[in-house]
Amino acid sequence: MKFMKLGTKPDSFLSKGDNVRYVTNELETEIIIIIGNVKFYLHKFPLLSKSGFLQKHIATSKNEEEKKNQIDEIDISEIPGGSVAFEICVKFCYGITVTLNAYNVVAVRCAAEFLEMNETFEKSNLVYKIDVFLNSTIFRSWKDSIIVLQTTKDLLSDDSEELVKRCLGSIASTASIDTSKVKWSYTYNRKKKLEKVRKPEDGVPKDWWVEDLCELHIDLYKQAIKAIKNRGKVPSNVIGEALHAYAIRRIAGFSKESMQLIDRSLINTIIELLPDEKGNISSSFLTKLHRASIFLGCEETVKEKLKKRVSEQLEETTVNDILMYDLDMVQSLVKEFMNRDPKTHSKVSVAKLIDGYLAEKSRDPNLPLQNFLSLAETLSSFPRHSHDVLYRAIDMFLKEHSGISKSEKKRVCGLMDCRKLSAEACEHAVQNERLPMRVIVQVLFFEQIRANGSSTGYSTPELTTTTLNTEDDEWDHEKEF
């Protein structure tokens, strides 16, 4: 971290309890400055020579007699940065050594501006020195710029607003730079896809800046992302990755417990910042945001916007992404997906997704039959390379709902095309006592056709085996497919 030292004298400031500060020298106190519950016992000359504000507000004695008996008292509790920033300004006036760094420079700069410690009253005054430090050092440092920006959130002054703009400009400019020119340190701890270990020859990743900005409060983060987007040099998918990293940092795991601890405005802000283009946000992240918007009771327009975004990338979604949804919501997503007139390959992916979802949801003995049928029938026209996972869902439903009638069981099994079961699935089905006898006969019939085709030299193309990875992934006969 960069820093700047001002002054050469040793520290002669002492404290009396928590609320009194004074300077040790032979001169008597001439002025008391009150800031909140803290009182500073000081001398006029060092202050008046550098502060226009104090010159205006401290009375001067008319004669020596009055001067001996008079102690001016002034309350400036409204000073930005409070007593800590004011004490640094005072020490500067006394020539006492002070150290400025990214953590305190903004507060001191605002306090100095409040006290009018500018060039009008003394050349190279405190405001000037701080501005030189900011421009030559702080705003040229990536991490210091972020720290400085973070410290502005508790300061309410026109001067702090100007500093925020300068910080944002520095951060946006640095984040937008060509990665080949990035020579400074940055934080990069996220796992990359396929557990790829980055090598020096890989160069600096495009999203190198993402994690450092996660330290910012949401209001400042919003301004930083907008400033970066306005530069127009950072790809939308990197912006999406930045928002994902920030959300994960603030909402651990997107669990109900973690979401109970956050404010709705956090989710609303992240949603507002999402890139509009399809594919720049992962489907997994979109589903997490959508679930969070439902859980937190966000506005309907927000929830509908996210539902549409999820449906647009439904073919990229995994079963784990949608397991937290109820069947009505998943059916709504499927219908939204169908309204886009999707291509065949997308339909195949979504059919596989929903089959896997039903296989998991069927484990719930309280799942209504009509809900199961309604969702499954919504995709009845979708092409599937294999009906293995659909069979798995049907078998699990029959296992957990053994009390349904024969006609209901027949309707459930009617969802499946026995011709599209793999050999392993057929082997399981013919031994499955939960299936109606008619279905077992159909399976045996098509297996016979398959066997006859093999004996005559014609073989049916092997169907793709589809397995959903779950903790309880075994059939009753301890066979997987």
UniProtKB/Swiss-Prot annotation:
- What Gene3D superfamilies has UniProt attached to this entry? Potassium Channel Kv1.1, Chain A (3.30.710.10)
Where would I find the NPH3 domain in this sequence?
207-450
Q: Does the keyword Calcium apply?
A: no
Phosphotyrosine: modified positions: Y391
List UniProt keywords, sorted A-Z.
Cell membrane, Cytoplasm, Membrane, Phosphoprotein, Ubl conjugation pathway
Domain comment as written in the entry: The BTB/POZ domain mediates the interaction with some component of ubiquitin ligase complexes.
Protein name stated in the entry: Phototropic-responsive NPH3 family protein NPY4
